[in-house]
């Protein structure tokens, strides 16, 4: 059993199998990938590779060359927090050392003869975004995540598809897919000709490509066909007897050279009979003439006397040709009837012959290889003039130039594996052999001998993580730069000596490419930060979309489906609903990604039917053909498989295998699903569709005011808390020395002696989803802490476990129709106790700009605003902290200069006498929007360099400075304490050299002083005392003192740097002189209309909040918290919720029993407690917690017991849940009826409800679809410019569209006047709107409506088409 007691809570674990390995760090894929990209210590980091692939760059005349020497990465300038506040990018600068070499050239030959000059220069590439320790990026102050991409692995793939032209015919294709470069498609057409396409251009016969690669006709025939030699003897055609030619049933009699039949047609030639015939001396057999008639010559036939070519190779034999050939002794034919070959290549030759004939005439070239290269050039670049050398170079560049073509290591490995090649892995371009072997294998596939690939098999799809994606972007940027440098080379004529690397390189190109990727790329996403789970799963997401991936509109059903190889690698449950279903996936819990990008799943080895403890990680390709048993296979105590036949998996099929055949067994049952799905208890009893909704909705749960962990968990909660950055974890073990709201100090000891670690906590920060981010300590002074233990909870965490909801007492029963259609009835107690209350923080910002008429000003002095409307603003015009904000209130006052109208001389005179009037400024203040209500919790003010800071900015600067000073002071005190502890530890080990009085005690020479006495004395006494020790001790003391002085200097430097950054002028966009951000915290209580959900996809809307006294109550008087509709369970088939509520109720009842022991507080209540807890822990199969409880001290036991008194916590891992026997034992222990139901009384009448009701405890979540953020109403507001109709959507303060179908509804009711209003004055009759408003304010009747703007839009559209449209009144005389 692994030590999982790093958490601060004990759970009764129901696992069947003890875990062999820890769940790997959930975020290691991204971390590893980025570290590899930026790792400059080893020469093989991703960034180095990219530079080396682009440099050196030479100019066309070989005069100059630019080489890459080395690169160095700087330190980030601002901290993560500052970047988020100031809207900056958390990044580093990259220093590239570039060498420019100027070559001496020989005037006559133009060859390089030596080096004339070498210059080296460092070039800065600014702003390469740096991954934060929480695996995200801060881009322009916003936290983003780069999602991993799941794309087709480079290599070769063979496919079989239905023909689009011929019905019921299969088409066979092969594709060679590089990571970068031209794709190569081989395909058969309807007439069995093998063609090749390059990059989806026009197809050419495959032999054309082979000729362009330099192969002659005979070579190609020999590569693809077995050559059969036919001997001519006495007018008969004889060939050697080869039994392999007669594998299938034989069409003709086999005769020996004398014409005797040795085997009859229509019978199979068995191996035995063939061997017998060879024994009997059969060497030559007759080759039937009728079969010879449709064969082709493999070599040309030459007349021996004249030397003239009678028949060229690939001549089709007919009777007249055979008559002439009989004069030869022997000739060769291409045996296209052999096994695994067909006539495709011969047909291709027939096709390309015509093309080459035409080209010969037009190009006046005889060499067929050159002609073939020209043909390919013409297909790839139609309409361009061509020279044969250029064409050959072009074909060579397409596939054999490392700059243009890259298969990568993965592609090379896949090619070698599939085609049985042995090309070294560093050859990442194609070879001739690759192309030939691919065509050969495709012919094999067509003839039923090869293996067709499955494009959705995880051996053919790989993961590109952040490091690789960034490397690709960097490569694109550098390639652009390379092109620009080559263009600059050509424009350089004179003064080559004066050129510096900086003149040639423009680093901006690289920066813009990278920033574009982070801001606009499809894979760089705004981080989902609703709760820690949503963050972790976002970073583990695998997307098939993005650059070089699929397009969601075109992705078919097969790509989206669950594949057998997903088992243990990709979660089959968690994927979005909607058009992205199946294209966006998540890694399974235990899955890892190897360095080639393939996903691996863990298994335990099985040897001769015995399960070993060796864990191996295998990719989908490695596990092909192996027999794998499920984790639920019965195994005895020694690890032997019990049953003789086991249900095992092989290549995705389930089969019965003997236990000796089984080679692997699943690590555990839960390895199939991902992180979110493994948080659902009793997942095995839920329908997959509902489990999908359950996993997705847990990611939307809002962090509540007080988090509480689920009574029924799965054991996964602490793993997520362990790997999410929200929690604070101890780096090293020790004892808690000091704790307050903002910091924790831990005192420990290592090889060097005592040390003190310092941890800070963040408070009330806003996340991307506007939820509140807050950390609070969960350890007390004096607690012992292990390394890696959670010492402070983040949001949605409770005692180091994920806690995204609340345990609520629920009853499945209808309640006066209020829980119709999944609605939820909630007790008022839940609202009163703030159970489901959450805090949300909104950020509002306003900027003051520099305009052509003057500068905008942030001020309290606003024209035409009442005094009481600005009472809550301070002198600087910004809302004070603590102000209660209501919709429509001013948050920040701002005035903007009006464009001046030239004043008349009189006005100028009056202004000169009475001073400036506020008449030439306009109110442009920031107002609270319609739905914003809350308290101002923070204000940030940024001022541009050269502009004066206002009072508020100065105050906030002073406040921040004070906080920094306090933190520095605390850390200095702790460092002093650490120094004293180390000194005391040193002195307490060594004997004294003379008699001394230390504290209250006298010591003789040779004695050692007590550490407790040493700790009492002050520093000055220490300096004199140290002289009473040996020279060695004095030296060690001096070393310690120096070490701490250096540490203090470092701390001071760090502090000064922080102060310097604080004092720095703020970086603001051009034109902006001041930026103010106001943060408003809103408390959102549970309301009617809020969406709630359980963990099993059981979601609903709160329909009513009922007084506690009216809710149904239990016999003991306790009323139910929530009433759910029982009809929501059977049709949805998520029975897991029923089992969860049973187990939850058991937890509560057992908690009550523990509380009773506490309440009785008898003499030996500790013994009683321990006995009770042991009894509960002995129910699971493994009973792994028993030993742990026995080993606890009384103090520790009390801690765990107090936690359990509120409800005993269970862990039922997925697929290993509580079984029936355990349930019945638990029911008995908790004194609950076996049907799990109870009597209930109606809260309104006090009568007993007729039926017994299922009451239990379920973990309920409040989701971030809050009614306060959805409800929206408008009277008047903005109108669209062209149509003059109200705009749409809440964000724009728009109206509700009254569409076509709504019009039908009013027509159906005959509501003509209402309908006319809807279509005119309430929509787009501009004049009508004004006149209606006037009439209403004056209390008159609304006048008749005018013409809607839409009509004018239509007539203007017609006018633009030169049609004169006029509008006539009906009353006018008809002219």
Curated annotation (Swiss-Prot):
Keywords: DNA-directed RNA polymerase, Nucleotidyltransferase, Transcription, Transferase. GO terms for cellular component: DNA-directed RNA polymerase complex. It is an enzyme of class 2 (transferase). Pfam families: RNA_pol_Rpb2_1, RNA_pol_Rpb2_2, RNA_pol_Rpb2_3, RNA_pol_Rpb2_45, RNA_pol_Rpb2_6, RNA_pol_Rpb2_7. GO terms for biological process: DNA-templated transcription. It catalyses: RNA(n) + a ribonucleoside 5'-triphosphate = RNA(n+1) + diphosphate. Its EC number is 2.7.7.6. PROSITE patterns: RNA_POL_BETA. One of its GO terms (molecular function) is ribonucleoside binding. DNA-dependent RNA polymerase catalyzes the transcription of DNA into RNA using the four ribonucleoside triphosphates as substrates. The RNAP catalytic core consists of 2 alpha, 1 beta, 1 beta' and 1 omega subunit. When a sigma factor is associated with the core the holoenzyme is formed, which can initiate transcription. NCBIfam families: PRK00405.1, rpoB. Belongs to the RNA polymerase beta chain family. This is DNA-directed RNA polymerase subunit beta.
């Amino acid at each position: 059993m692994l030590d999982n007691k790093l958490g601060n809570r004990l759970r009764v674990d129901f696992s069947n199998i003890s875990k062999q390995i820890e769940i790997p760090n959930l975020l290691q894929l991204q971390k590893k990938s980025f570290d590899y990209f930026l790792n400059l210590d080893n020469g093989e980091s991703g960034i180095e590779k990219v530079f080396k692939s682009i440099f050196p760059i030479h100019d066309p005349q070989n005069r100059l060359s630019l080489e890459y020497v080395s690169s160095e990465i700087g330190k980030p300038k601002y901290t993560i927090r500052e970047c988020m506040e100031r809207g900056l990018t958390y990044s580093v600068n990259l220093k590239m050392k570039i060498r420019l070499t100027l070559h001496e050239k020989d005037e006559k030959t133009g060859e390089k003869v030596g080096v004339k000059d070498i210059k080296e220069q460092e070039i800065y590439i600014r702003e390469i975004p740096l991954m934060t320790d929480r695996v995200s990026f801060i881009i322009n102050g916003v936290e983003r995540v780069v999602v991993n991409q799941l794309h087709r692995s480079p290599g070769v793939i063979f496919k079989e598809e239905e023909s689009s032209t011929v019905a019921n015919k299969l088409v066979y294709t092969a594709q060679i897919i590089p990571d970068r470069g031209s794709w190569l498609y081989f395909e058969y057409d309807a007439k069995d000709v093998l063609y090749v396409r390059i990059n989806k251009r026009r197809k050419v016969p495959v032999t054309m490509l082979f000729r362009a690669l330099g192969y002659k006709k005979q070579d190609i025939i020999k590569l693809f066909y077995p050559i059969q030699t036919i001997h001519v003897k006495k007018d008969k055609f004889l060939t050697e007897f080869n039994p392999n030619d007669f594998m299938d049933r034989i069409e003709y009699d086999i005769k020996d050279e004398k014409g005797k039949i040795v085997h009859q047609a229509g019978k199979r030639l068995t191996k035995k009979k063939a061997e017998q015939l060879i024994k009997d001396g059969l060497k030559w057999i007759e080759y039937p003439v009728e079969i010879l008639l449709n064969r082709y010559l493999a070599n040309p036939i030459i007349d021996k006397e004249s030397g003239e070519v009678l028949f060229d190779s690939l001549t089709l034999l007919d009777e007249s040709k055979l008559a002439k050939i009989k004069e030869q002794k022997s000739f060769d034919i291409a045996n296209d009837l052999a096994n695994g070959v067909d006539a495709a290549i011969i047909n291709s030759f027939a096709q390309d012959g015509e093309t080459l004939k035409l080209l010969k005439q037009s190009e006046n070239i005889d060499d067929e290889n050159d002609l073939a290269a020209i043909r390919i050039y013409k297909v790839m670049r139609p309409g361009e003039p061509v020279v044969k050398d250029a064409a050959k170079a072009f074909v060579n560049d397409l596939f054999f130039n490392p700059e243009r073509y890259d298969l990568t290591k993965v592609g090379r490995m896949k090619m070698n594996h599939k085609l049985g090649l042995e090309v070294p892995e560093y050859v990442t371009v194609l070879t001739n052999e690759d192309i030939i072997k691919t065509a050969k294998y495709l012919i094999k596939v067509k003839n039923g001998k090869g293996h067709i690939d499955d494009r959705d098999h995880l051996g053919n799809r790989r993961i590109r993580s952040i490091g690789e994606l960034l490397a690709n972007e960097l490569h694109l940027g550098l390639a652009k730069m390379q092109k620009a440098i080559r263009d600059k080379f050509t424009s350089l004529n004179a003064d080559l000596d004066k050129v510096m690397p900086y003149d040639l390189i423009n680093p901006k190109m690289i920066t813009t490419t990278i920033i574009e990727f982070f801001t606009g790329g499809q894979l760089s996403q705004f981080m989902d930060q609703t709760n820690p789970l949503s963050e972790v799963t976002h970073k583990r997401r695998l997307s098939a979309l993005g650059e070089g991936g699929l397009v969601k509109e075109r992705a078919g059903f097969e790509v989206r489906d669950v594949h057998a190889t997903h088992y243990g690698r990709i979660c089959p449950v968690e994927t979005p609903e909607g058009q992205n279903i199946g294209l966006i996936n998540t890694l399974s819990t235990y899955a890892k990604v190897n360095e080639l990008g393939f996903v691996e799943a863990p298994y335990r080895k099985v040897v001769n039917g015995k399960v070993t403890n060796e864990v191996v990680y295998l990719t989908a390709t490695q596990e092909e053909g192996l027999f794998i048993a499920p984790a639920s296979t019965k195994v005895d105590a020694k690890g032997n498989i019990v049953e003789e036949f086991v249900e095992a998996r092989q290549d995705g099929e389930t089969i019965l295998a003997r236990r000796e055949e089984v080679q692997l067994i699943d690590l555990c049952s839960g390895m199939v699903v991902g992180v979110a799905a493994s948080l659902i208890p009793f997942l095995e009893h839920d329908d997959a569709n509902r489990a999908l909704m359950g996993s997705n909705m847990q990611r939307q749960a809002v962090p509540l005011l007080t988090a509480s962990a689920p009574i029924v968990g799965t054991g996964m909660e602490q793993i997520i808390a362990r790997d999410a950055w929200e929690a604070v974890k101890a780096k090293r073990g020790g004892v808690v020395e000091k704790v307050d709201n903002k910091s924790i100090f831990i005192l420990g000891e290592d090889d060097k002696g005592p040390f003190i670690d310092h941890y800070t906590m963040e408070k009330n920060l806003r996340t991307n989803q506007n939820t509140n981010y807050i950390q609070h300590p969960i350890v007390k002074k004096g607690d012992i802490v292990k390394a890696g233990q959670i010492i402070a909870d983040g949001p949605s965490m409770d005692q180091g476990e994920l806690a995204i909801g609340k345990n609520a007492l629920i009853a499945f029963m209808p309640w006066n129709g209020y829980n119709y259609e999944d609605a939820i009835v909630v007790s008022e107690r839940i609202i009163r106790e703030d159970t489901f209350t959450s805090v949300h923080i909104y950020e509002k910002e306003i900027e003051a700009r520099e305009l052509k008429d003057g500068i905008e000003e942030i001020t309290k002095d606003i024209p035409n605003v009442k005094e009481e409307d600005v009472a809550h603003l301070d002198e600087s015009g910004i809302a004070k902290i603590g102000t209660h904000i209501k919709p429509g209130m001013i948050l920040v006052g701002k005035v903007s200069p009006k464009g001046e109208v030239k004043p008349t001389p009189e006005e100028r005179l009056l202004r000169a006498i009475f001073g400036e009037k506020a008449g030439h400024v306009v109110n442009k203040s920031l107002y609270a929007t319609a739905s914003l209500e809350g308290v101002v919790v923070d204000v940030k003010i940024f001022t541009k360099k050269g502009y004066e800071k206002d009072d508020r900015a100065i105050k906030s600067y002073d406040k921040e400075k004070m906080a920094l000073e306090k933190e520095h002071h605390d850390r200095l005190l702790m460092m002093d304490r650490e120094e004293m502890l180390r000194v005391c530890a040193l002195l307490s080990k060594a004997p004294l050299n003379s008699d001394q009085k230390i504290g209250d005690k006298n010591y003789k020479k040779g004695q050692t002083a007590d550490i407790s006495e040493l700790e009492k004395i002050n520093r000055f006494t220490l300096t004199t005392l140290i002289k009473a020790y040996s020279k060695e001790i004095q030296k060690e003391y001096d070393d310690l003192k120096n070490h701490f002085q250096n540490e203090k200097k470092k701390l001071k430097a760090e502090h000064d740097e922080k102060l310097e950054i604080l004092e720095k002028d703020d970086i603001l966009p051009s034109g902006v002189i001041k930026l103010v951000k106001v943060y408003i915290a809103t408390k959102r209580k549970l309301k009617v209309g809020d969406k709630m959900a359980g963990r099993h996809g059981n979601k609903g809307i709160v329909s009513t909040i009922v007084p506690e006294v009216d809710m149904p109550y239990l016999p003991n008087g306790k009323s139910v918290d929530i009433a759910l509709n029982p009809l929501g369970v059977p049709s949805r088939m998520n029975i897991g919720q029923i089992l969860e509520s049973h187990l939850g109720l058991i937890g509560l009842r057992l908690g009550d029993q523990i509380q009773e022991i506490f309440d009785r507080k008898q003499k030996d209540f500790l013994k009683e407690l321990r006995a009770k807890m042991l009894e509960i822990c002995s129910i699971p199969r493994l009973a792994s917690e028993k030993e742990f409880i026995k080993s606890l001290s009384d103090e520790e036991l009390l801690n765990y017991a107090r936690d359990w008194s509120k409800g005993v916590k269970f862990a039922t891992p997925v697929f290993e849940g509580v079984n029936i026997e355990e349930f019945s034992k638990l029911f008995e222990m908790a004194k609950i009826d076996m049907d799990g139901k109870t009597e209930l009384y109606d809260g309104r009448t006090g009568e007993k409800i007729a039926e017994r009701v299922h009451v239990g405890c379920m973990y309920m979540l409040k989701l971030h679809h809050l009614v306060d953020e959805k409800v929206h109403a408008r009277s008047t507001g903005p109108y669209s410019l062209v149509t003059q109709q109200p705009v749409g959507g809440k964000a724009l303060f728009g109206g509700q569209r009254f569409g076509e179908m709504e019009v039908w509804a009013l027509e159906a009711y005959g509501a003509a006047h209402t309908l006319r209003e809807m279509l005119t004055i309430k929509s787009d009759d501009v004049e009508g709107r004004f006149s209606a408003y006037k009439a209403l304010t004056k209390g008159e009747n609304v006048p008749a409506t005018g013409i809607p703007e839409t009509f004018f839009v239509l007539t203007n559209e017609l006018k633009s088409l030169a049609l004169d449209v006029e509008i006539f009144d009906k009353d006018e005389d008809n002219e």
